[in-house]
UniProtKB/Swiss-Prot annotation:
It is found in: Secreted, Extracellular space, Extracellular matrix, Basement membrane. Residues 1-17 form the signal peptide. GO terms for molecular function: calcium ion binding; collagen binding; extracellular matrix binding. This is SPARC. It comes from the Eukaryota. GO terms for biological process: negative regulation of angiogenesis; negative regulation of endothelial cell proliferation; positive regulation of endothelial cell migration; regulation of cell morphogenesis. Pfam families: FOLN, Kazal_1, SPARC_Ca_bdg. It comes from Coturnix japonica. Residues 256-291 form the EF-hand domain. InterPro entries: EF-hand-dom_pair, EF_Hand_1_Ca_BS, Fol_N, Follistatin/Osteonectin_EGF, Kazal_dom, Kazal_dom_sf, Osteonectin_CS, SPARC/Testican_Ca-bd-dom. GO terms for cellular component: basement membrane; cell surface; extracellular space; nuclear matrix; platelet alpha granule membrane. Residues 84-146 form the Kazal-like domain.
Length: 298
């Protein structure tokens, strides 16, 4: 996989911004994307009028904003009802920040290009409870374009590149960590063994034949990276399963560059329940059943 793909996805894999879209029966608790500032960064300031003949000092009164700690999912914003209680309501797409470039556009599964993820989720919110809204998901980052079909031969090559990429992402994070807290101490200990292994295949645009041989030869190096990525995605909620929402931070940047992404993740869902369990995930990447260990998801 090319280096520029690697560095783009390295950031996406770690940031794990909030999940893109929640499936039915899923509770998604994330910050509103309409602003980069934390919700309720500044409490509402209540102005005090001036009196012509004040008899005592008038102190400024700071009222608590009910929305300060009330988080809404993508597409919704917090408002206060008549009882001064916070509630989440659909955001008006026209209130989304103006976009400045093509890279902010996103493509929905309806094959429609939206100006930004904010516009997409605000639109989707208005469709809640409808068949169209249930089927609508954020497909990938960037304007909609033709995605060629994934051939069977290409599908078998995809996990080879993905495994190598996951390993290299961890190594890069380890090398850049120092005081950045990119990895936990437990994760560092695992990656250190990979980093110090002289037999490790260096990052590069390798042939699928070389990647296949390296996986067979250095199989143990790939066990932890596969578990690690699962743990990075399994966040909302942390339940041992990956939903469409949780996969989005990984798949959305990948699809325009790796056209087998969608088919690969669909194939991983062996029981077609719309969720990918750890066992299904690890199996997709060629990890043997005896080496699948939930304790490695750290």
């Amino acid at each position: 996989m090319r280096a520029w793909i690697f560095f783009l996805l390295c950031l996406a894999g770690k940031a794990l911004a909030a999940p893109q879209e929640a499936l039915p029966d899923e509770t998604e608790v994330i910050e509103d994307v309409t602003t980069e500032e934390p919700v309720g960064a500044n409490p509402v300031q209540v102005e005090v009028g001036e009196f012509e003949e004040p008899t005592e000092d008038v102190e400024e009164i700071v009222a608590e904003n009910p929305c300060q700690n009330h988080h809404c999912k993508h597409g919704k914003v917090c408002e206060v009802d008549d009882n001064n209680s916070p509630m989440c309501v659909c955001q008006d797409p026209s209130s989304c920040p103006a976009t400045s470039g093509v890279f902010e556009k996103v493509c929905g599964t309806d094959n429609k290009t939206y100006d930004s993820s904010c516009h997409f989720f605000a639109t989707k919110c208005t469709l809640e409870g409808t068949k169209k809204g249930h089927k609508l998901h954020l497909d990938y980052i960037g304007p909609c374009k033709f995605i060629p079909p994934c051939l069977d031969t290409e599908l078998t090559e995809f996990p080879l590149r993905m495994r190598d990429w996951l390993k290299n992402v961890l190594i890069t994070l380890y090398e850049r960590d120092e005081d950045n807290n990119l990895l936990t101490e437990k994760q560092k200990l695992k990656v250190k063994k990979i980093h110090e292994n002289e037999k490790r295949l260096e990052a590069g645009d390798h042939t699928v034949e070389l990647l296949a041989r390296d996986f067979e030869k250095n199989y143990n190096m790939y066990i932890f990276p596969v578990h690690w990525q699962f743990g990075q995605l399994d966040q909302h909620p942390i339940d041992g399963y990956l939903s469409h929402t949780e996969l989005a931070p990984l798949r959305a940047p990948l699809i325009p560059m790796e056209h087998c992404t969608t088919r690969f993740f669909e194939a991983c869902d062996l029981d077609n329940d719309k969720y990918i369990a750890l066992e299904e995930w690890a199996s997709c990447f060629g990890i043997k059943e005896k080496d699948i260990d939930k304790d490695l998801v750290i």
